[in-house]
Amino acid sequence: MWRVKTLNLGLSPSPQKGKPAMSTPLRELKLQPEALADSGKGPSMISALTPYLCRLELKERCNNSSPVDFINTENNFLSEQFSHPSTHIEACQRESDPTPESNSLFHTLEEAIETVDDFVVDPRDDSIVESMVLLPFSLGQQQDLMLQAHLDTTAERTKSSLNESLGLEDLVGKEVAPCVEDSLTEIVAIRPEQPTFQDPPLGPSDTEDAPVDLVPSENVLNFSLARLSPSAVLAQDFSVDHVDPGEETVENRVLQEMETSFPTFPEEAELGDQAPAANAEAVSPLYLTSSLVEMGPREAPGPTVEDASRIPGLESETWMSPLAWLEKGVNTSVMLQNLRQSLSFSSVLQDAAVGNTPLATCSVGTSFTPPAPLEVGTKDSTSETERLLLGCRPPDLATLSRHDLEENLLNSLVLLEVLSHQLQAWKSQLTVPHREARDSSTQTDSSPCGVTKTPKHLQDSKEIRQALLQARNVMQSWGLVSGDLLSLLHLSLTHVQEGRVTVSQESQRSKTLVSSCSRVLKKLKAKLQSLKTECEEARHSKEMALKGKAAAEAVLEAFRAHASQRISQLEQGLTSMQEFRGLLQEAQTQLIGLHTEQKELAQQTVSLSSALQQDWTSVQLNYGIWAALLSWSRELTKKLTAKSRQALQERDAAIEEKKQVVKEVEQVSAHLEDCKGQIEQLKLENSRLTADLSAQLQILTSTESQLKEVRSQHSRCVQDLAVKDELLCQLTQSNKEQATQWQKEEMELKHIQAELLQQQAVLAKEVQDLRETVEFIDEESQVAHRELGQIESQLKVTLELLRERSLQCETLRDTVDSLRAELASTEAKHEKQALEKTHQHSQELRLLAEQLQSLTLFLQAKLKENKAESEIILPSTGSAPAQEHPLSNDSSISEQTPTAAVDEVPEPAPVPLLGSVKSAFTRVASMASFQPTETPDLEKSLAEMSTVLQELKSLCSLLQESKEEATGVLQREICELHSRLQAQEEEHQEALKAKEADMEKLNQALCLLRKNEKELLEVIQKQNEKILGQIDKSGQLINLREEVTQLTQSLRRAETETKVLQEALEGQLDPSCQLMATNWIQEKVFLSQEVSKLRVMFLEMKTEKEQLMDKYLSHRHILEENLRRSDTELKKLDDTIQHVYETLLSIPETMKSCKELQGLLEFLS
C-alpha cells in the first residue's frame, strides 16, 4: 500500500508593501519579459527551462533528499484529511511537461533506485492506490503546462543546429524508447467562489471518478520516477513567508512528500529499453490537499509519431540565454542572486522548509491514471552504459575550426560557472542548520517507518566527461549571444556617431547665423559712416554756396541742390531703415529658430545621457559577471592541471610497464643470438654496402638526412632478416611445434605493443586536449575582458564628447545672449543717432527758411529804393549788394545758430517719428506758412517773391546748361579713356590666353612624360618579376633533377641489395624453404614501405604542430599586448572620469542648480 501526501502553496503569495514579489529563480529564468502576470488575460507563451538545469535539479534532489522529508509529514496528512471538501468540479486539464533529459542509462538507473528507496515498503498490500486532491496551480505552474505545444513546434527547428554537437547523450538517447504521451495525470479542478486565474483548459476534461484498481509494481516505479519535476524541486527548495494586508497570517508549506509501498525491491527491478523513457518523462508538479478522490487505471496507448520528438537524447527544448534575458530589462541584481540560490539546492532547506499553508480558498479533485505496465528486459544497463562511455571519445581539437573552438570555450565557461555555484552550495551544506529553520519545519510527528537509501556515485573522470558533454549542448547559443551583444554595441556606436554629426551640423548652422548677424552689423556700421561723411560733405557744400558771389542765384541753386540731395538722402534713409527693420525681423525669427533648435538639442543630449547611463550600468553588470566567470575558471583550471598531472603519472606508469614488456622481449630474443655465426657473410656485405653509402652521403650533403633514415631502415631490415634467418635455421633443425609456439609468442608481443602504443596515444591526446582547452579558456577569457574594456572606453569617450558638446552649446548660448545684447544696444544707438540727425536737419531747415526770409526782405528793400528800375531787374545791379549782405547774414546766422541750439537743447521734446505729424517736414512747412502772418503786405511780398523766383529760375537754367555742357565734355573724355582701357584690356587678355594655351600644352607634355615614365617602370617591374620567376623555376628544376637522380640511385641500390640478399638466402636455405623465405622477404619489404610512409606522416604532423605552436605564441603575444593597452586605456579613462568629477564639483553654485549637472554628479559618484 502506498500513499501520496502533498502540502501545497495554494495561491501565489502576494507581495508585501515595499518589497518585490517573490518567485523562484528558475521560474524567473523561464519567463520572458512579455509573459507578465495578468489575471484577465490568457497565459502567454514562455520559454522552457534548459535541459541542463533540469538535470542538475533532478541530480541534486536525488543526492540531497533525506528520509526525514518523507517521514515528518505523515501525521499531518492524516490530520488534514477531511478538512476542506470540494464543491464544484471544473474541466480537467491534461498536459505534459517537457521531458527532462538524463545523462546516461546508468544515471537514469541511479535516479530510479534512489527514488524507489525513499518509499515506505509494506508487503501486505501492493495494489491499493489512495486518491488525492489537487489545488489550482499558481501562474508559473500554469505557464509550465503551456510549454508542450510550443516545444513540439520548435523541436524540429532546433534539431538541425543541435545535431552537430551531440555527444554522449545522443548515444544514450538512441537506446531510449519514445515516451508515452497519454500516460499522464488528469487534473480535475474545482472552481472557487473567487478564482484568481481564469485560463482556458488545455486538454480534454473528464470529471468521472474511476474506481480503485490494482497497480502493478512496475507502474509504481515508473510513476515515482515520473513525479520528479523541476518545479517540484523548486517547491521543496524555496519557501516564502509574508503577510497579506488585511488578511490572516496563514502557514504555507511548499513541500512535496511521497509514500509508497510495493512488494519488489529496487535491486530486483531490471529496466529494459523503455525504462529511460518512463524515467525521463516529467509531469507538472501536483499541489495536493486532504480531500480524496478515487483513482483508477486507464489504458495507455502505445507510442506514436509525435513522441519521437520527446526522446531525451535530443535537445529540442528552447531556452533563453542569460545575456539576452538581461538585455530585456529585468532587474539583474535580484535575478542573479536567485539564480545562484537556485543552483545551490541546500539540503538544509529541504529538511526544514518553512512556509504558509493557506486555508481552503479552493480545492481541486483529480483522477490519477497510472501508466501502463512496461516490458521488463533482461539487459544489463551498467554494461551498456560502460560500452557507450568507452565508445564515445572526445573530439580532436587540432582538427576543429576556430568557430568550433570558440563554441567549446563558451560551453566550458558556463559549465565552470555552474560547477562553481554547486561547489559553493555543497560547502554551505556542511554547516549546521539554523535552530529556527529546524524548529519551523516540524509540523507533524515523525513516523517510525524505516527508510533506506543506497546512493551510487560515478568516478570523477566520467562525471567530468559527462558534464563537459552536457555543457557543449547547453552553451551553443552563447556564441550567438556574444554576436548579438557586439551587434548591439555597434548599433549604439553608430547612433552616437549620428548624434555627433547632427550636433556638428547644428553648431555649423549656429555659426553661420552668427556670422550673418555680424555681417549685417558691419554693413549697418558702414552705412552709418557713409551717412556721416555725406553729412559732412553737405555742410561743406553749404558753406561754399553761402560764400559765392551771386548771393541769390547761389543761394537758390544751393537750396535746390541741397533740398534735392536731402530729399534723396532722407528717402534712402527711409529705405535703409525699412531694410534694417526687415533684417532685424529676420534676425529675430532666426534667433527664435535657434532657441527652439537649442531646446531640441538639450532634449536630445538629455535622452542620450540617460541612454548612455543605462548602457553603462548594463556594461558594469556584465563586467562583474565576466569577472566572476574568470575567477571560477581560474580555480577550475588549477583542478584540471592537477588532474593532468595525475594523467601524466599514469602515463609514466604505462611507460614503465612498456619498458618491462620490452625487457621481456629482449630476453626472448637473447636466446636466439647463438646462431649469428651463420650470417657473417651477410654482415660483411652489409658493411661494404654501408661504406659505399657513407661515401656517397659525403658527396651528397644536401640529402644527408634522408640517407640516414634509409641506412637506419636498412640496418633494421638486416637485423630482422638475420633474426628471421636464425629462426628459419632453427625451424629446419627443430620441430614445427617450436615454430608455431614462437609465432604465437611474437603475435602476442605485437598485440601487447600495439595496445600499449594505442594507450599511450590516447593518453597523449587527452593531455594535449586538456592543455589546449585550458589555454584556450584563459585566452578567450582575456579576450572577452579586453573587449569589455574597449567597449567601456568607447562609451566613456562618447560621454566625454557629449559633455564637451554640452559645454559648447552653453558657450554658444552665451554668445547668442551677448549678440542679442549687442543688437539691442546697436538698435538703441541707431535710434538715438536717427533722432539727432532729424533734429539737426530740422534746425538746418529752419535756418534755410530764415535765410530765405532775409533774402526776400533784402530784395523788397532794394525794390523800394529802385522804384524807377522796378520794371527791369538786371542781374548786375543786384549782385553787388547780394555779395555784401550774405557775409553779414553769414555772421548773423553763425551767431544765431548757437543761441538757437542752446535754447532748443534743454527742451525735453518727444522723439519724432519719420512719418508722424511732428517730423522735420511738417515743422518746415508750418514755419513757412506761419511767417507771412507777421508781414503787413502779404500779397505784395508774394508777388515780388514770384518774380524773383522766376528770375532765379532763368539763371539756374543757364547755369545748368553750362554745367551740362561741361559734363558732356567730361563724359566724352571719359568714354574715350574707357575705350582705350577696353582695347588695352583686350590686348592683355589675348596675351594671357596665348600664355595659358602655352601652359596647357606644357602641362599636357609633362603629363605624357609622367605616364610614359610610369608605363616604363611597370614594364621594367614585370620583366624583373618574370626574370626572377624564371630563375626560381630553373633553381627548382635543378633541385628536382638532383632529387630524381638521388632517388634513382637509391632505388637501384635497394634493388641490388634485395637481389644480393635473396641470392644469399637462396644459397643458404634448403630448396623446400625458398618459397617461405621469398614470401617473408616480400612481407618485410611491404612493412618497411609502410613504416617509411608512417614516418613521413609523423614528420608532417610534427611540422604542423610546430606551426600551430608558433601561431599560438604569436596570438598570445598579441593578446598580451592588447591587454596591456586596454589596462592603460582603462586607467586613462578612470583618471579622466575623476578629473571630470572634480571639475564638476568645482563649478560655482549658480551652475549647480542645473538638473543635468546634478544628474551627472550623481551618475559619476
Curated annotation (Swiss-Prot):
The protein's induction, as recorded, is: Expression is cell cycle-regulated, with an increase from prophase to cytokinesis and return to basal levels at the next G1 phase.
- For this entry, list what GO says about its biological process: cell division; chromosome segregation; establishment of spindle orientation; mitotic sister chromatid segregation; positive regulation of intracellular transport; positive regulation of spindle assembly; protein localization to centrosome; regulation of attachment of spindle microtubules to kinetochore
Q: Where in the cell is it found?
A: Cytoplasm; Cytoplasm, Cytoskeleton, Spindle; Cytoplasm, Cytoskeleton, Spindle pole; Chromosome, Centromere, Kinetochore
Which tissues is it found in, per the record? Detected in testis, but not in the other tissues tested.
In terms of InterPro entries, this protein maps to:
Astrin
Where are the membrane-spanning stretches?
Answer: none
**Keyword S-adenosyl-L-methionine attached:** no
**Interaction with KNSTRN: where is this region?**
453-821
Under which name does UniProt file this protein?
Sperm-associated antigen 5
Protein's organism: Mus musculus (Mouse)
Q: What is the lineage of its organism?
A: Eukaryota, Metazoa, Chordata, Craniata, Vertebrata
Q: Which gene encodes it?
A: Spag5
